[in-house]
Amino acid sequence: LTERHLLPKFDEIAPQAGAWKTLEVEKIPWISYPYEWSFYQLRDAASLTLELQTEALKHSLSLKDASAYNVQFIGSQPIFIDLLSFEKRTPNAPWAGYRQFCMQFLAPLAMASYEPRLGRMPAGWIGGIPLNLAWKLLPWKSFFCAGLQMHIHMHGWAEQKYGDTRKAAPKVRQVKINDKALLELVGSLRRTVDSLRGPSIPGDWTDYYSNTNYSDKASAAKLQIVELAVKKTGGGLLGHDLG
């Protein structure tokens, strides 16, 4: 997984006092947060999480959570940074990260896909969008997507009806799901995520280059300024537009 750049590279170093193992992990050059990402960054991060859960299940492991904050980007490549999320799978146990995945990945993606104005909601719900809210905000036509029907609408309805998680916990612990069924669940989530498309609406920047008042001479001057700045800073691989 490290060779495929799905996990950061790491070295095992002398263990610290009281530690079983100590790992020195590759540093991420730029830290970003899910509520800052574009639609397709969030979708790529969701796909990575599901890919790792699939690989984990094949080796009798599982991700104990599915937080979007477990993912960072190196360039345009998502990378899963929380190595401690992997744990031994308890036989026939449900996926502990399922609800969190739906709240932090699937609900924001579905809402942005069907109603672009809802795309900024994750900034107000750091822990994920409550499913009993998400299913009410999605348009009725989303119900005809089998994946959203199961993972958002029915999930949200059940959460609303049986909302007291303390009372529900004993029943959840009684649920049994074998490896095959869990792989099918993850596969269903992957198909649903892959089916969603980013919003396509005209915005302030849609026709920027065709409507801009830059003349050819002004554009050339701007390019010259940028090239000069890059040369002075050593031409690093990472740039940030400060406006």
Stretches with model-predicted labels:
Residues 2, 6-45:
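Conserved structural core of kinase catalytic domains
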Residues 31-39, 171-175, 206-214:
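Glycine- and acidic
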Residues 40-64, 108, 112:
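Conserved kinase catalytic-core helix
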Residues 94-198:
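N-terminal auxiliary segments of SAM/dcSAM-dependent transferases
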Residues 200-231:
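Class I SAM-dependent methyltransferase Rossmann-like catalytic core
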